[in-house]
């Protein structure tokens, strides 16, 4: 075999400088026809982190304690999925509360006079790690702004083994105008702790994803807590004005100024004049 046709033993990728701009796995280089050892080990480590995030138990007590220190009440409920094994194999059960939780929430709602503007739900989802890292700092920013604007908020409802649609049942039982659920997103190989927010106007059992607005990738390396709260409050205002949410309600929140730039709206991917 002619040696000149063999690949270099180790070769860098010309895209290497782009790695400064993204955590995505690009420009990994090669050794012969394979990945170098370091990127291969990094991949295996990231995969292990993602698996751990899915199976990490939900430390709801820590979140409840943090809320209590800020003078906020919480309520612990459980979905109809009895454990993690059932939760992963039966998504439908994660979308509804178990009977004991339904009864407890009904009793709790009976003590309310008037209507709650926003029911706040926190569920472990597919990454309890995301919920435990980001719930308290995000809620601190959201609640400060929401209360300043005069919105009435429910106690924070914590749900074990919950999926997105469980917030519909909770919002309906609380007779809330709107609901938002903070939930751990499916872990990626570069983001095992990504938090998602799902917002719904007039929550009720049976709604599809078309009736929800999603704000995703809330974490330090993604969408900041402040910007996520800013976008959610915009959706709340517009939902109340237009009496709807989901595909008919677009997120056109004004992007806050950075480095002295004027605020702007629209798609940040489009070139600016």
From Swiss-Prot:
Cofactor note: Binds between the large and small subunits.
Gene3D superfamilies linked to this entry: Ethanolamine ammonia-lyase light chain (EutC), Ethanolamine ammonia-lyase light chain (EutC), N-terminal domain
Obligatory cofactor(s): adenosylcob(III)alamin
Catalytic activity as recorded in UniProt: ethanolamine = acetaldehyde + NH4(+)
EC number: 4.3.1.7
Entry-linked InterPro entries: EutC (IPR009246), EutC_C (IPR042251), EutC_N (IPR042255)
GO terms of biological process kind: amino acid metabolic process; ethanolamine catabolic process
UniProt superkingdom: Bacteria
A Gene Ontology molecular function term of the record: ethanolamine ammonia-lyase activity
GO cellular component, one term: ethanolamine degradation polyhedral organelle
Pathway(s) the chain acts in: Amine and polyamine degradation; ethanolamine degradation
Keyword Aminoacyl-tRNA synthetase recorded: no
Record: residues binding adenosylcob(III)alamin: 164, 185, 214
Its biological purpose: Catalyzes the deamination of various vicinal amino-alcohols to oxo compounds. Allows this organism to utilize ethanolamine as the sole source of nitrogen and carbon in the presence of external vitamin B12.
Protein family per UniProt: Belongs to the EutC family.
HAMAP family cross-referenced by the UniProt entry: EutC
Subunit structure of this chain's protein: The basic unit is a heterodimer which dimerizes to form tetramers. The heterotetramers trimerize; 6 large subunits form a core ring with 6 small subunits projecting outwards.
NCBIfam families linked to this entry: PRK05465.1 (NF003971)
Identification of the protein by name: Ethanolamine ammonia-lyase small subunit
Species this protein is from: Pseudomonas aeruginosa (strain ATCC 15692 / DSM 22644 / CIP 104116 / JCM 14847 / LMG 12228 / 1C / PRS 101 / PAO1)
Gene that encodes the chain: eutC
């Amino acid at each position: 075999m002619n040696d000149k046709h063999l690949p270099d033993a180790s070769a860098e990728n010309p895209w290497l400088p782009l790695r400064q701009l993204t955590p995505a796995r690009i420009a990994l280089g090669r050794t012969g026809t394979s990945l170098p050892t370091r990127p291969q080990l990094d991949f295996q480590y990231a995969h292990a982190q993602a698996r751990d995030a899915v199976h990490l138990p939900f430390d709801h007590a820590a979140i409840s304690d943090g809320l209590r220190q800020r003078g906020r009440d919480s309520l612990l409920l459980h979905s109809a999925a009895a454990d993690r094994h059932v939760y992963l194999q039966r998504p439908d059960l994660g979308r509804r509360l178990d009977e004991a939780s339904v009864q407890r929430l009904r009793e709790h709602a009976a003590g309310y006079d008037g209507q709650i503007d926003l029911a706040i739900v926190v569920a472990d989802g597919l990454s309890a790690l995301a919920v435990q890292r980001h719930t308290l700092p995000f809620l601190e920013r959201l609640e400060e702004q929401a209360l300043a604007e005069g919105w009435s908020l429910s106690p924070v409802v914590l749900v074990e083994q919950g999926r997105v649609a469980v917030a519909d049942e909770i919002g309906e039982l609380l007779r809330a105008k709107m609901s938002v659920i903070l939930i751990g997103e499916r872990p990626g190989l570069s983001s095992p702790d990504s938090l998602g927010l799902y917002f719904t106007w007039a929550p009720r059992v049976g709604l599809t994803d078309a009736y929800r607005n999603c704000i995703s990738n809330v974490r330090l390396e993604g969408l900041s807590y402040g910007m996520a709260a800013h976008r959610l409050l915009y959706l709340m205002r517009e939902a109340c004005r237009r009496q709807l949410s989901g595909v008919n309600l677009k997120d056109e929140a004004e992007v806050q100024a950075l480095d002295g730039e004027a605020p702007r709206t629209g798609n940040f991917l489009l070139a600016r004049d």
